[in-house]
């Protein structure tokens, strides 16, 4: 399988899932990058070819993938495109969110090749009262480590 492009699909109300996804995409070294941001709008009908690595990043709420993220991705399908799945969680556990995202992506034709979880900024965080408990430098290193594993 030859990979010629990367597509980042993200749902990121606090921008944290998007930041993690962007770091993973940069780590691939692939310059042909398409982005689908589901934060404000659904993806619509989208077919991902086998030659495109897809990075899907979503936040976790209450141990599950944010329901709105799944709703906005429902018309995204793949022809055995490889996928890296990322669940970003805040002050709680991610529980089975990655398993849930794996089932969702697999049902839509993705070939899941990797999954990761990252601790990120909690949705209750504010500039005056940040409750982010991981720094960008650590994220970037983990994103690059994920690239090596893939």
Predicted regions and their residues:
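FMN-binding flavodoxin-like domain, especially the glycine-rich phosphate-binding loop
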Residues: 1-7, 12-150
């Amino acid at each position: 399988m030859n990979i010629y492009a990367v597509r980042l699909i993200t749902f990121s109300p606090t921008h944290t899932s998007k930041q993690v996804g962007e770091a993973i995409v940069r780590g691939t070294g692939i310059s042909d990058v398409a982005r689908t941001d589901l934060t404000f709008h659904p993806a619509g009908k989208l077919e991902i070819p086998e030659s495109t690595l897809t990075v899907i990043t979503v936040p976790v709420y209450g141990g599950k993938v944010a329901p709105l993220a799944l709703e906005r991705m429902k018309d995204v399908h793949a022809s055995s495109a490889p996928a890296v799945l990322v669940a970003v969680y805040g002050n709680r556990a991610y529980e089975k969110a990655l398993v849930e995202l794996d089932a969702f992506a697999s049902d839509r034709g993705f070939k899941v090749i990797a999954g990761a979880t990252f601790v990120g900024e909690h949705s209750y965080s504010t500039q005056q009262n940040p409750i982010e408990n991981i720094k960008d430098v650590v994220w970037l290193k983990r994103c690059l480590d994920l690239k090596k594993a893939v």
